């Protein structure tokens, strides 16, 4: 399927005025990379829960709701936190921002936990707090609440990271004046194997908004 | 009753992932929702599950929860009278 | 006038019928599909009501002429059936004739098979083959194979607004000239996973649900699939195709309030409706009917009513929720309600909001309670999902 999508885009690449990327941020292997620079590096042995808790504590954010989130939302939340702090947008810009995220495992990590809570006949207590997170877009909801982002939200499920798709989707949003900024990327987690990559597309910025650059930065961790 | 209150505080912190709180931070009369511990509607549902699981109390209407989940003191009182396990 | 994107075909299977005609008849006579659950064994059997599709998996597989031993989740089966109907309705014979895509939404995916075989995955590796159907994308891929679509295939999963977002993406792909034809819609089957999940949220009613009623007790889950065929102006002209209606407006916005609860002001819903009107270049008074999200939960119906009031003021058009007949079909809801919106345009009628008795006291805006014939040119369809994901679509007759 992926090969076909790639081809499809090659056939129809029409580019208008070029857009830019303000910042990139990735989380993987207990490291955080911001605009090519490693800003946090923790022991490889830490689980995602331990790693995310440490990052939360060290960042000095006071947002107790963080601890209630599932791991996919925690990953989404922290990546957006580091990225948006670096971009420092005024709140009226944030309100109009669009979110376009993607991954391959949807909410599988939390689905499993919910399934575990309903599979035992003797101990049948499905958790409402776990069930709420069995949708991949809940993480987008969490960052929308945190940053008061009210623009368009879309979550796509792909076999693998698809820079071209994300690129064209953000371009369409900005060119059709649906948004002035698009928070874009990939957030995927299955147990302790996690990987996030987010970037902010905007009319101005340090990097050119191109497939090659997005792919290069995605591979950077 | 004191033991039950203590147990409730521990359970609530654990079940609702209130990582920033310790048992000593929660007074018996603190409001659990709104300004107090800042719990929300999903937390109320988790508390309903906890009542069932730990004390054999089944609530079927979330509105009942509102009257019970006022504070640790009120909750402990309710559990002491209605518990089946 | 700025035209929207043409709809040339539709297909549907829901608790009130296995094709468009059956659904239409059920709507015209307010025939409900809500009843006791029969295809799934659950301890909640007596305390929930659902909108279940009567056909069993093997019946659907047979009608699709699937070879024996093929593994299709129920979402993939329902989706394949509805999508095939849509293609047939649009009289499409050769997919490869134009650049054709599929945008399908689901939230349940292959959960029905996973939960059935979960306990044996470790002890009996033979059952592991069912796990391949688990991902959301599997149902989309299966439907694409059934239709022979290879050009562009993707899945959207944004909770209960999923199908509305699939329709929005399809319309955009055509407007941007990237595709000539897109099959858009969604599919979700009932599963223990969703039944138990919604049960713990205490928003399932043990009776037939009563959207927008003052004494509403919660929702009934349902299962369904529906797809629309969207085609570009050029294809319509060249093939001289019959157009059923147009997707003229669409928008999505985030409520930015809570993971599951809607805000008291209905901010996300308000923004979605406002932006959809803007895209369609319409004034609020031009909307003749709103097919509301109307899940019959305390929270949604109040919040949605507030948002509707904010947009339409004292001139709220006829509105109703058809979920009282079909149940809430999650990622299929936006698609089946799109079909109903087009039926409203075709039949020039408004569907009643069944089971309604008393208006919500805070607002006092009652929904339409009687089936009525009237001039219908523009229909708004709302779909709001967990995560604050709110979408509004507008369908127009020309």
Describe each region flagged by the PLM.
Chain A
Residues 1-221:
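Conserved "HGTGT" condensation-loop signature of ketosynthase/thiolase-family condensing enzymes
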